[in-house]
Amino acid sequence: MLCVALFAVASAVAQEKPYTVVFYNLENLFDIYDDPETHDEEFTPDGAKQWNEIKYQKKLSNMERVLFDIAAIQKDYPIVIGVSEIENRTVLEDLISQPKLKGANYRLCHYDSPDARGVDVAFLYRADVFKLEGSDNIKLVVEELPDFRTRDLVTMWGTIDGEPFYFLVSHWPSRLGGKEASQFKRDACAKQIREIKDSLLNENPATKVVVMGDFNDDPGDKSVSECL
C-alpha cells in the first residue's frame, strides 16, 4: 500500500511551497535474524520464507526505487514518510542508507510496539524542512479486549516553515476472523485517533493534523467515514 499526498505551506514571504507526504506499507520489512521475543521465525534463513541476505537486500532496493521515483516525479524528496510493517529500527536505517535515498538525509522516529509479530510503524522525516519538537508512542486500546496487542500509534510534532504540524501514523487491526466480527477493533482505533485530533485542534486551531496509516478498511467503512 502506497499513498502520496501533496500540500502547500505559506512561507514567511506569503509564497506557497509544495511539499510531499507519503504513507508506505513496507509489507514485512524484516531483517534475517531471529528475535526470540517475537514471532518472526518465518523471516529467517531457516523459516518458511527462507529469508536471506539476498532477498533482504533486493527488498530494500525495491523500496528505494519506489521512493526515489516519487522524488523524481515531484522533483524533491518527500518531507515525511510514514511506514508500517517494519521489524525494527535497524531495517529503517538500512533503508535510508540506500544510495538513492542518502541525499534526503532522512531521520527516524521509531518506537517498538507490543505486536506479537514484532512489526512497528514509524516515520522518516527531513530535518531540513520538518523541525521536530517531540514524538510519542500511544497504545491503541480496544476496551472490550483489555489484553489486546497491536501496533502502537506513533506521533510526532513540530513545524514546517513556522507552521505547527502534528503527524500520526498507525496500522489498525486486520480483518482476521471476518470484516464484521473484527470491525469493533478498527472502530475503537479510529475513535481514539479522533479524540487526539480534536484535542489538538481545541488547544490550537492553527495546528495542521495529518493522519496516515494502513487502516485495513475502505473510505466508506464506518471506522473511516464516521469514527475518524
Whereabouts are the PLM-identified features?
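N-terminal, active-site-proximal structural segment of metallo-dependent hydrolase catalytic domains
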Residues: 12-99, 105, 109-119, 190-191
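Catalytic metal-binding/acid-base residues of hydrolase active sites
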Residues: 27, 87, 173, 215-218
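Metal-dependent phosphoesterases centered on the DNase I-like endonuclease/exonuclease/phosphatase
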Residues: 186-228
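Active-site flanking residues adjacent to catalytic metal/cofactor-binding acidic residues
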Residues: 24, 84, 170, 213-214
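A Trp-anchored, charged/polar loop motif used as the substrate-binding/catalytic surface
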Residues: 64, 147-157, 191-198
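Active-site His/acidic residue clusters
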Residues: 37-40, 167-182
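Structured beta-strand-rich core segments of catalytic domains in phosphoester-bond hydrolases
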Residues: 86-164, 170-172
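Bacterial Sec-dependent N-terminal signal peptides
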Residues: 1-16
